[in-house]
């Protein structure tokens, strides 16, 4: 088991953190997943438990008409990958509204959900499960958030700055 897998397991099984800050934690998972819009709400992960947690947190908080689909497939290097998606457009709009977004995508990040440092840490923990990797500190300490949109990256930079965590922004080739 890799160091990143151990960290993700520790976070995803921290029931106290999740229960106290469920909305902020969920917001981090959903906003920083693969997609968060009226057209598509989804995430992919190699961790089955994280995929189940993503779907569970949606159902626990938001009244849904249809379903959230979790698919298992062989990804890169024959690694099992789980894709979770919200199937119905009305359900996606309901989820967006729950987190203070509109269906047109005018509001990309809702900073109101991150009112204090505990909510910010919960958001970062959720985001970590959806889009991050961390290297073993015994070798080379490096934490990476891979975010889809510039506004989400701006929110992440603001949060890290407010929490006095050092970071640097880099744009991967071909991702401009």
Locate each region found by the language model.
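N-terminal, positively charged regions that mediate nucleic acid binding
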Residues: 1-40, 44-54, 58
